């Protein structure tokens, strides 16, 4: 039996709270069960040097975990003087996922940075971050339209992500920490509204997984992400 008696294909309760902080152009607290991530989107009237004069914008992301977001305190990466490989991998994943649903030409020469800070971690922090960051980004873009800076929202749609895996021989959706730490196979899937995939990260922690198991996991992810997309649309009133 899964934690909280969930079915194999059942996602955790999802809550998306918009306008969570005061200053950011887009601010969302996203909750996947006990995993909670704060996503703040900031708009700046500048672009990276490699995009100067290209008449297009940029979307990027940063990711971090608060020291006591886990069972025992972690040292802040700032105190260590460098970011870890996991952090850099995750924030690049978030940024790639967001850029997949933005018309960068329509954004103009602006940069939107989405800061994703994990307040509490219980598995699936990167997938929750992507799902919440998309809503924060949508709000930031909508503000540019409302303020008369842009004529149309550059968002081409929504993107969401979920974890799937094989635990005790069963394919399961939206893994909690206790499942993730014991999974034979762990996979993160990022998908846009029409079902196309942005990224699939899959690893066999023990026994290799079969082609049929891969297809089963992707089907589970598709079902779960559709529920997340529904939650995003409901939060945004779309």
Curated annotation (Swiss-Prot):
Chain positions recorded as phosphate binding sites: 86, 124-126
Record keywords: Nucleotidyltransferase, RNA-binding, rRNA processing, Transferase, tRNA processing, tRNA-binding
Protein name: Ribonuclease PH
Source organism superkingdom: Bacteria
Top enzyme class: transferase
Protein family (similarity comment): Belongs to the RNase PH family.
Gene Ontology MF annotations: 3'-5'-RNA exonuclease activity; tRNA binding; tRNA nucleotidyltransferase activity
EC number in record: 2.7.7.56
Family annotation (Pfam families): RNase_PH, RNase_PH_C
The reaction(s) this protein catalyses: tRNA(n+1) + phosphate = tRNA(n) + a ribonucleoside 5'-diphosphate
């Amino acid at each position: 039996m899964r934690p909280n008696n969930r079915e194999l294909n059942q996602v955790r309760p999802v809550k998306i709270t918009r306008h969570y902080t005061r200053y950011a152009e887009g601010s969302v607290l996203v909750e996947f069960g006990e995993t909670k991530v704060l996503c703040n989107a900031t708009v700046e009237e500048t672009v990276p040097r490699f995009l100067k004069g290209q008449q297009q914008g940029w979307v990027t992301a940063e990711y971090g975990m608060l020291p006591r977001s886990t069972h025992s305190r972690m040292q802040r990466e700032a105190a260590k003087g460098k970011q870890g490989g996991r952090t850099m991998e995750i924030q690049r994943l978030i940024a790639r996922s967001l850029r997949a649903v933005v018309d960068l030409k329509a954004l103009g020469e602006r940069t939107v940075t989405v800061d994703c800070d994990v307040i509490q971690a219980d598995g699936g922090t990167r997938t929750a971050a992507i799902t919440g960051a998309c809503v924060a980004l949508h709000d930031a873009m909508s503000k540019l339209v409302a303020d008369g800076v842009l004529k149309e929202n550059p968002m081409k749609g929504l993107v969401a992500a979920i974890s799937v895996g094989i635990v005790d021989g069963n394919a399961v959706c939206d893994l909690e920490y206790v499942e993730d730490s014991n999974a034979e196979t762990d996979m993160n899937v990022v998908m846009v509204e029409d079902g196309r995939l942005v990224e699939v990260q899959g690893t066999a922690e023990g026994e290799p997984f079969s082609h049929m198991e891969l297809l089963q996991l992707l089907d589970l992810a598709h079902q779960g992400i559709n529920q997340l997309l529904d939650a995003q649309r409901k939060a945004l009133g779309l």
